[in-house]
UniProtKB/Swiss-Prot annotation:
May play an important role in fibrillogenesis by controlling lateral growth of collagen II fibrils. It comes from Homo sapiens (Human). Residues 399-447, 487-545, 546-590, 805-862, 863-899, 1099-1156, 1157-1172, 1441-1499 form the Collagen-like domain. Residues 615-624, 1029-1040, 1176-1187, 1388-1397, 1457-1467 have a biased composition (Pro residues). This is Collagen alpha-2(XI) chain. Residues 487-1500 are annotated as: Triple-helical region. It holds the Pfam family Laminin_G_2. Residues 994-1003 have a biased composition (Gly residues). GO terms for cellular component: collagen trimer; collagen type XI trimer; collagen-containing extracellular matrix; endoplasmic reticulum lumen; extracellular region; extracellular space. GO terms for molecular function: extracellular matrix structural constituent conferring tensile strength; metal ion binding; protein-macromolecule adaptor activity. It comes from the Eukaryota. Glycans are attached at residue 1604. The gene is COL11A2. Residues 239-253, 406-421, 497-533, 542-552, 650-663, 842-861, 897-906, 1115-1133, 1217-1230, 1346-1365, 1376-1386, 1413-1422 have a biased composition (Low complexity). It is linked to Otospondylomegaepiphyseal dysplasia, autosomal dominant: An autosomal dominant form of otospondylomegaepiphyseal dysplasia, a disorder characterized by sensorineural deafness, enlarged epiphyses, mild platyspondyly, and disproportionate shortness of the limbs. Total body length is normal. Typical facial features are mid-face hypoplasia, short upturned nose and depressed nasal bridge. Most patients have Pierre Robin sequence including an opening in the roof of the mouth (cleft palate) and a small lower jaw (micrognathia). Ocular symptoms are absent. Otospondylomegaepiphyseal dysplasia, autosomal recessive: An autosomal recessive form of otospondylomegaepiphyseal dysplasia, a disorder characterized by sensorineural deafness, enlarged epiphyses, mild platyspondyly, and disproportionate shortness of the limbs. Total body length is normal. Typical facial features are mid-face hypoplasia, short upturned nose and depressed nasal bridge. Most patients have Pierre Robin sequence including an opening in the roof of the mouth (cleft palate) and a small lower jaw (micrognathia). Ocular symptoms are absent.
Length: 1736
């Protein structure tokens, strides 16, 4: 066996299994190769290969972006050893001070670490927090940051740690840890970095291992002889002649790699070990005691550079290749070669001050070496007085521990911690039902499957340890670090295997609303709903803008003392003081190895007088902070004067999210889940604060004596033995060289001032020692000269808060702070004193509408004025109904600042906000405790205030808040645009009688009739119409007050009147609209009712309040002048039906209205109930000529006949010819009241007949049903404003009345333009009614006299000539329902007149019963395809709305289960022509309806010609749906049935086409976008093959896929199996385009694909590597989205199935596959790809 292999196969001498004392459970445990555990051979990001310490070695170069970590449990599944060795071969960048390896606990506490540089630090902290940071070992005087290779070993045993560097220098430091130290292995181990530390390791590393026990650290030095190839060295003469001569028990144990493979060639290879006993090169004989660690009090520091002399003179014949240890200049900038190392002489000569030492430690004394025990003689005499001990730098003399300090204050509660770590996976669920059988795959051609050659792996290791929830715990540990050390996002972690199919779940909640459908036809206007309930009180509005700075306030009282300031910067080490005088003589003590602290020296010379700072209040010192890392030495900056506080900067944007709080408590462990894959290494966690030391556990009981073990190997020389017998005092030795600076001792008491010595030469500055205890306060010194401005130091670690100090003086008024969070409502404060009235401010914008004020008392009646040009305004009418709340006005300008109110009660503590970035420096705080005196710097100039800091970065989104309470309804939206005019609605049922209309305008006076005979005095006639307006008469006496009138119709809102005087302050207004939802706050307690506030300034005029109770009738005012025409108001909402009014006087006929537009025929309504008998109607117009019948004699009126049964429909008769108009018949006798008939079926519309001649004007008939609502008229000109009325006397304020119930709105009629109002005549006294005089002779016409009194109504005169068409009259209000008139004799049926123009739209009637479904209107052109929007957030649950009216029929739903046969229904009307079926039999003509009232003559509107759409792929030509003989030209008769059938057929076909577009069926002509869309539209579809078209263009590129509805609607595409590189085809074998796959990815959220390959006898094949569609390499080792679904190769049978399930949709489908063991011979089998399935 060759003496040396490559140096990267470092032969680590491992402890023997026999007789080694290691930590429990670690006997024979293997070493841990940290580089391999961190996957260095696979070269992760930031790592590349480099040359090692020997040219042929392999090392790894680590750059800054590398992030290398792994769960600690993965490396140490059995726990971390108590005693261990840490071995490494490393080369760092010159000048670097960075960690090499750090181990963190689950709580993020740094437990173990090794930091390289100058100096070398070893970090250790066990579970009890020991040792404290100041006691952690630091190896000063060593520098490993020189850019050269170093072999470093660290041995930790007991209470000490030993560092061995290059086998030349060995330093031991105490490690005061607990007796049973335990390190937590549930955390993470990180290479080359620390959490929240900028310094990272940069350099090369060849070996890094952790070995249980300490022997490996010492044995590693024996391998110095096993250097690079060709560098074999001679052995010293005192060593054994040759390795081959050793006994088998003397062979050293070595750590090997297979020599025929490189570390990176086989990723799955494991280290294996052969154990050889160690050999020792010691000149002593006999047995060697076991290794003993030094006691905590002793310090062992052996610098063996003198013991291992340079070797140039001893090795002149050894030739080393020039590249053996050459440092690469291009890497770190240093060149040259190191001198070769030769064999060392491990023996030393004996002298006065020397003992025999080996390379590995001190040798044994003669007594110990031979006998194993020291024989003690009699006690010697008392020795002479010892010399004073000289504490040289480098020595550490530990004094006794000080008394326990007082307990610190309870710290403030920490911010809310992050969520705890994810618990272990739960128990496996019960197996689900068996899935549906998959469809049979297409049989592939034999032997043409894709064959990818496999190769067997040459070796296989055992399965790794179980890692249950390491990744989740590591993430929880490292959450704090992800903000500070945010690297590129790592790959997603492994997911567990999918469980079996579960039981079907309960029905899910209602899904979200689908996409908005096309706009339907506009429905009829619904009734106005009742007024809604008053909304809840809105939330407080957003905080106002920042106000202007107020005037400076009065200086306040002194505030409480602030918290102690941050610790000051550490001062420089002072110069060495003069040598103290010898102390008083002490008693002679026994000579010890290391003496106790010597007698205290004389006090040193007093230092220069320092400046005395202002004395601050004594604060209680906080506990010591965590020791920070030693930064690079910088120049000491001088302390500048305190600057004045600068003006506050602009408000910055919210800073980034602060660091999370401390880790929450670990939850209880869940039950152990199935074994998961090893998790990816987590990010490093942050430095946690040191934990409090735990209580020392009770000592355990002494164990039983164990059996004697076998003879162990020859041990190493132990540490220093116990004190021997006092020897003879030796001669005083030569003065030794100055040692390194030691730790400063405790400050002694102030001694007597000595004489001033001469100024010595300033010495060189030593290294910074640890910070000593605080010195006493020195006397006040004179101020020094101003110094230079120093650099700004780094921000120190904030100390713990101290006690609050005393109250300081009140500071000046600061600038307004940022608005705070809204606190809870405080209790009502006391009423403040009334302030002086301020000056009148500018008129603010109109505020929100307030509630109705209390009704004021009636004002005093004004005096009657004379007839002026304009009378005073009339009495105020009753208030109208409450209108809707107006939109809130714009925010007014900020008023002047009010007086300070009484302080409210403190609100509840708010939730802790996110920590922002460090803001700009604040104003100076209270003077903290006196810091350590620094060097007196020169005084700097006074600085200017700094500019405001830049705005912080945008904060990260916070965690989700608590679910807020239900918000108030938002403000009403803006009115939408007018939709297209809808079809005419169905006629409603007859409305209830409305209120009586007002009197009509006076008609034209008719011609005087011939005088009739004098009649007897009849009953008093009805009041006649008003005559012409006479001249104004004299004012009559005051009439009696009239009875209270009916409530009038709400008047229109008049113009805004002149500004009135200041009114009494109104009550609080209604809440405004809901503001934007704020942060959810907790419900506060209800506050108390406050006292009334001060009188406010005059408010703007409020809107009309709700109607109050009717007031007393006031006196009749003087007639006012006629006002100008008002502006017609907007149409009011539909009011409730009013109570039946008294019968009004008969009005005059209004002029006929304009001709309306033609309406579509509506379905016949149900027959209404028979009304009461009405008055006889006027003679009707001449009817159409009927068929000639035989003239019969008029018989006497017969008794009323009974109601006959409904006869069967007659056959369709031929249309008769139009006859000439018949003679007007006499009005028939009133017939009996008939019973209510059943609803008749709709008859076919008759052909229009010619218009008949205009008949004579008849008497007024009964009031007809309200006509359709007319279009709103043009707005009239605005009326002139009336003159301002005189101010009434100010009435006393009335008591607040009970708020009245809101009155029901009255019926709203359309307001027409009001006619000119005549002056009101005086009220005449009622005269007695005289008898009618006799007939007088006709006299000559006299002159036109004054208008006489209104005479009685005369008899109806003959019909006058038809006047010209008048202007369009106003629609009258709904009259009472008239009694039914007598049934007239049936007239002959006339020809059907032409359809009249549609009339004006009448008032909306009451909701009618459900009518027949109307015809579907023509569909509009399809809009452009919109992009699929993102799914919106679910809105807040709205209050349940009233039930809406029946909408138009929806699309046909899925076929339901067949119901039981129903009862035979009545025959329905003939349906429209179907889309594709043959024409049905012609329906029977319905019974001829009674002739309607002839409409006014109008123009015949020709129907528009129907333009058929051009035939496209997705439309159907309507004319093709009819038989050829039924098709008619477009210019045919518009009223013929064939044209309507064609239209209806086209509508049906269009409806089907639209239905297929809205609800695709998955066929080739109606493809869906994805299978998810098919599932949403047709949830009843089974699994199978369907057509999809993801890009929704032309359907020619649609392709067929397999839809797995059972799995939620997956769209699966099958790969081809006849090519060497995978491509994907549809179910018919056609390739799927790249564009279609891209669209399919855009419509999906995840995808998965299975890959399987057969096993062929090997225990495990090499890893399968897959290439995704985006060229990513996918394998279980590199991607968290690839996992083994079934491992058949583990049992050497079946197949192994990998599942790729990824949210990165660009990775699928898989395009190629290969194996990593391609060097092996091929074997049977290939890779079988399953379909790729996309889930939308």
């Amino acid at each position: 066996m060759e003496r040396c292999s490559r140096c990267h196969r470092l032969l680590l001498l491992l402890p023997l299994v026999l007789g080694l004392s290691a930590a429990p459970g670690w006997a024979g445990a293997p070493p841990v190769d940290v580089l391999r555990a961190l996957r260095f051979p696979s070269l992760p990001d930031g790592v590349r290969r480099a040359k090692g310490i020997c040219p042929a070695d392999v090392a790894y170069r680590v750059a800054r972006p590398a992030q290398l970590s792994a769960p600690t449990r993965q490396l140490f599944p059995g726990g971390f050893p108590k005693d261990f060795s840490l071995l490494t071969v490393v080369r760092t960048r010159p000048g670097l001070q960075a960690p090499l390896l750090t181990l963190y606990s689950a709580q993020g506490v740094r437990q173990l670490g090794l930091e390289l540089g100058r100096p070398v630090r070893f970090l250790y902290e066990d579970q009890t927090g020991r040792p404290q940071p100041p006691s952690q070992p630091v190896f000063r005087g060593l520098s490993l940051a020189d850019g050269k290779w170093h072999r470093v070993a660290v041995a930790v045993k007991g209470q000490s740690v030993t560092l061995i560097v290059d086998c030349k220098k060995r330093v031991t430091r105490p490690l005061p840890r607990s007796a049973r130290p335990v390190l937590d292995t549930h955390g993470v181990i990180i290479f080359g970095a620390r959490i929240l530390d900028e310094e990272v390791f940069e350099g090369d590393v060849q070996e890094l291992a952790i070995v249980p026990g300490v022997q490996a650290a010492y044995e590693s030095c024996e391998q110095k002889e096993l250097e690079c190839e060709g560098g074999q060295r001679e052995r010293p003469q005192n060593q054994q002649p040759h390795r081959a001569q050793r006994s088998p028990q003397q062979q050293p144990s070595r750590l090997h790699r297979p020599q025929n493979q490189e570390p990176q060639s086989q990723p799955t290879e494991s280290l294996y070990y052969d154990y050889e006993p160690p050999y020792y090169d010691v000149m002593t004989t006999g047995t060697t005691p076991d290794y003993q660690d030094p006691t905590p009090g002793e310090e062992e520091e052996i610098l063996e550079s003198s013991l291992l002399p340079p070797l140039e003179e001893e090795q002149t014949d050894l030739q080393v290749p020039p590249t053996a240890d050459r440092f690469q200049a291009e890497e770190y900038g240093e060149g040259g070669t190191d001198p070769p190392e030769g064999p060392y002489d491990y023996t030393y000569g004996y002298g006065d001050d020397y003992r025999e030492e080996t390379e590995l430690g001190p040798a044994l004394s003669a007594e110990t070496a031979h006998s194993g025990a020291a024989a003690h003689g009699p006690r010697g005499l008392k020795g002479e007085k010892g010399e004073p001990a000289v504490l040289e730098p480098g020595m550490l003399v530990e004094g006794p521990p000080g008394p326990e300090g007082p307990a610190g204050l309870i710290g403030p509660p920490g911010i809310q911690g992050n969520p705890g770590p994810v618990g272990d996976p739960g128990e496996r669920g019960p197996p689900g039902r068996a899935g549906l059988p998959g469809s049979d795959g297409a049989p592939g051609p034999p032997g043409t499957s894709l064959m990818l050659p496999f190769r067997f792996g040459s070796g296989g290791g055992d399965k790794g340890p179980v890692v249950a929830a390491q990744e989740a715990q590591a993430q929880a540990i490292l959450q704090q670090a992800r903000l500070a050390l945010r690297g590129p996002p790592g790959p997603m972690g492994y997911t567990g295997r999918p469980g079996p199919l579960g039981q079907p779940g309960s029905p899910g909640l209602k899904g979200e609303s689908g996409d908005l459908g096309p706009q339907g036809p506009r429905g009829p206007q619904g009734l106005t709903g009742p007024p809604g309930k008053a909304g809840r009180r809105g939330r407080a509005g957003a905080d106002g803008a920042r106000g202007m700075p107020g005037d400076p306030g009065v200086k306040g009282d002194r505030g409480f003392d602030g918290l102690p300031g941050l610790p000051g910067e550490k001062g420089h080490r002072g110069d060495t003081g003069a040598q103290g005088l010898p102390g008083p003589p002490g008693e002679d003590g026994e000579r010890g190895d290391d003496g106790e602290i010597g007698p205290r020296g004389l006090p040193g010379e007093s230092g220069p007088r320092g400046l005395l700072g202002p004395k601050g209040p004594p604060g209680i010192p906080g506990p010591p902070g965590v020791r920070g890392m030693d930064g690079p030495q910088g120049p000491k900056g001088s302390l500048g004067p305190q600057g004045e506080p600068g003006p506050p900067g602009q408000q910055g944007t919210p800073g980034t999210q602060g660091l999370p709080g401390p880790q929450g408590a670990i939850g209880p462990h869940g039950e152990k889940g199935p074994q998961g894959k090893p998790g990816l290494p987590g990010m490093p966690g942050s430095d946690g604060p040191p934990g409090h030391p735990g209580k020392e556990g009770p000592p355990g009981t002494k164990g039983n004596q164990g059996p004697s073990g076998p003879q162990g190997p020859l041990g190493y020389p132990g540490p220093r033995g116990v004190k021997g017998v006092d020897g003879i005092r030796g001669l005083k030795g030569h003065k030794g060289e100055k040692g390194e600076d030691g730790f400063p001792g405790f400050k002694g008491d102030i001694g007597v001032k000595g004489d001033r010595g001469e100024v010595g030469v300033p010495g060189s500055r030593g290294e910074d020692g640890p910070e000593g205890p605080k010195g006493r306060t020195g006397p006040t010194g004179d101020p020094g000269p101003p110094g230079l401005m120093g650099e700004k130091g780094k921000l120190g670690v904030p100390g713990l808060p101290g006690y609050p100090g005393r109250q300081g003086p009140k500071g000046s008024l600061g600038f307004p702070g940022f608005p705070g969070a809204s606190g809870e409502k405080g209790a009502r404060g006391l009423s403040g004193k009334s302030g002086p009235r301020g000056e009148r401010g500018p008129t603010g914008p109109r505020g929100q509408r307030g509630p109705r004020g209390a009704t004021g008392k009636s004002g005093a009646k004004g005096t009657s004025g004379g007839d002026g040009p304009h009378g005073p305004p009339g009495e105020r009418g009753l208030p109208g109904p409450q209108g809707p709340n107006g939109f809130p006005g714009p925010k007014g300008p900020l008023g002047p600042p009010g007086k300070d109110g009484l302080p409210g009660h403190p609100g509840q503590r708010g939730e802790v906000g996110f920590q922002g970035k460090t803001g700009p420096p604040g104003p100076p705080g209270v003077v903290g405790p006196q810091g350590a005196a620094g060097e007196t710097g020169p005084m700097g100039e006074r600085g200017h205030p700094g500019p405001p800091g830049p705005p912080g970065e945008q904060g990260l989104p916070g965690t989700a808040g608590k679910e807020g309470t239900k918000g108030d309804p938002g403000p009403p939206g803006a009115p939408g645009k007018d939709g297209p005019a809808g079809l005419r609605g169905f006629p409603g049922e007859r409305g209830l009688p409305g209120t009586a209309g007002g009197p009509g305008l006076k008609g034209n006076e008719g011609p005087s009739g011939p005088p009739g005979p004098a009649g007897s005095p009849g009953e008093r006639g009805a009041a006649g119409s008003g005559g012409p307006i006479g001249p104004p008469g004299r004012p009559g006496p005051q009439g009696p007050p009239g009875a209270a009138g009916e409530k009038g119709v709400p008047g229109e809102k008049g113009p805004i009147g002149p500004t009135g005087r200041d009114g009494v302050q109104g009550p609080v207004g209604l809440p405004g609209p809901a503001g934007p939802p704020g942060v959810a706050g907790e419900d506060g307690d209800k506050g108390e009712v406050g006292d009334p506030g001060q009188k406010g300034t005059k408010g703007n005029k409020g809107e009309h309040g709700p109607p109050g109770p009717p007031g007393p009738i006031g006196p009749v005012g003087q007639p006012g002048a006629a006002g100008a025409d008002g502006e017609p108001g907007a149409r009011g909402p539909q009011g409730h039906f009013g109570a039946k009014g008294d019968e009004g006087t008969r009005g005059f006929n209004g002029p006929p209205g304009p001709i309306g537009l033609q309406g579509l025929p509506g379905p016949s309504g149900e027959k209404g109930e028979t009304g009461d008998v009405g008055p006889m109607g006027p003679p009707g117009p001449p009817g159409p000529r009927g068929p000639a019948g035989p003239n019969g004699a008029d018989g006497p009126q017969g008794p009323p006949g009974g109601v006959g049964n409904l006869g069967p429909p007659g056959e369709k008769g031929e249309p008769g010819e139009s006859g000439s108009p018949g003679i007007q018949g006499e009005p028939g006798v009133k017939g009996p009241r008939g019973e209510r008939g059943e609803k008749g079926e709709s008859g076919q519309p008759g052909e229009p007949g010619p218009p008949g001649p205009k008949g004579p004007t008849g008497d007024d008939g009964p009031k007809g049903n309200p006509g359709p609502v007319g279009f709103p008229g043009d707005p009239g000109p605005p009326g002139e404003g009336g003159p301002r009325g005189q101010d009434g006397a100010k009435g006393d304020r009335g008591e607040d009345g009970e708020p009245g119930q809101p009155g029901s709105p009255g019926p709203t009629g359309e307001n027409g333009p009001p006619g000119p109002l005549g002056k009101r005549g005086p009220a005449g006294s009622p005269g007695s009614e005289g008898r009618q005089g006799g007939k007088g002779a006709k006299g000559d016409p006299g002159a036109i006299g004054a208008p006489g009194k209104t005479g009685p109504v005369g008899p109806a005169g003959p019909a006058g000539k038809p006047g010209p068409d008048g202007l369009r009259g106003l629609p009258g209000s709904v009259g009472q329902q008239g009694r039914p008139g007598a049934t007239g004799q049936a007239g002959p049926p006339g020809p059907v007149g032409p359809p009249g123009l549609p009339g004006l739209r009448g008032d909306a009637g009451a909701k009618g019963e459900k009518g027949h479904p109307g015809l579907i209107g023509l569909i509009g052109p399809p809009g452009e395809q919109g992009e699929k929007g993102d799914r919106g957030l679910p809105g807040p649950q709205g209050s349940p709305g009233q039930k809406g009216e029946m909408g138009i029929p929806g699309a046909s739903g899925p076929i339901g289960p067949g119901g039981p046969p129903g009862l035979p229904g009545p025959a329905g009307p003939k349906g429209a022509k179907g889309a594709t079926g043959p024409g049905g039999p012609k329906g029977e003509k319905g019974v001829q309806g009674p002739p309607g009232h002839p409409g006014p003559p109008g123009e015949v509107i020709q129907p528009l010609p129907i333009q058929m759409p051009k035939k496209t792929r997705r439309s159907v030509d309507g004319s093709r749906l009819m038989q050829e003989d039924e098709a008619i030209p477009t210019g045919g008769a518009p009223g013929s049935p064939g044209g309507l059938e064609e239209i209806f057929g086209s509508l049906d076909s269009l409806r089907e086409e639209i239905e297929q577009m809205r609800r695709p069926t998955g066929t080739q002509d109606s493809p869906a976008r994805t299978c998810q869309d098919l599932k949403l539209c047709h949830p009843e579809l089974p699994d199978g093959e369907y057509w999809v078209d993801p890009n929704q263009g032309c359907a020619r590129d649609a392709f067929r896929v397999f839809c797995n509805f059972t799995a939620g609607g997956e769209t699966c595409v099958t790969p081809r199996d006849d090519v060497t590189q995978f491509s994907y085809v549809d179910s018919e074998g056609s390739p799927v385009g790249v564009v279609q796959l891209t669209f399919l990815r855009l419509l999906s959220v995840s995808a998965h694909q299975d890959v399987s390959y057969p096993c062929s006898g090997a225990a495990r094949d090499g890893p399968l590597r897959l290439r995704g569609a985006n060229e990513d390499e996918l394998s279980p080792e590199t991607s968290p989205y690839v996992k083994e679904f079934r491992d058949g190769c583990q049992t050497q049978q079946g197949r192994t199935v990998l599942e790729v399930r990824t949210p990165v949709l660009e990775q699928l489908p898989v395009l190629d596959a290969s194996f990593s063991d391609l060097g092996a011979p091929p074997r049977r089998g290939g890779v079988l790809l399953g379909p790729v399935c996309f889930m939308g």
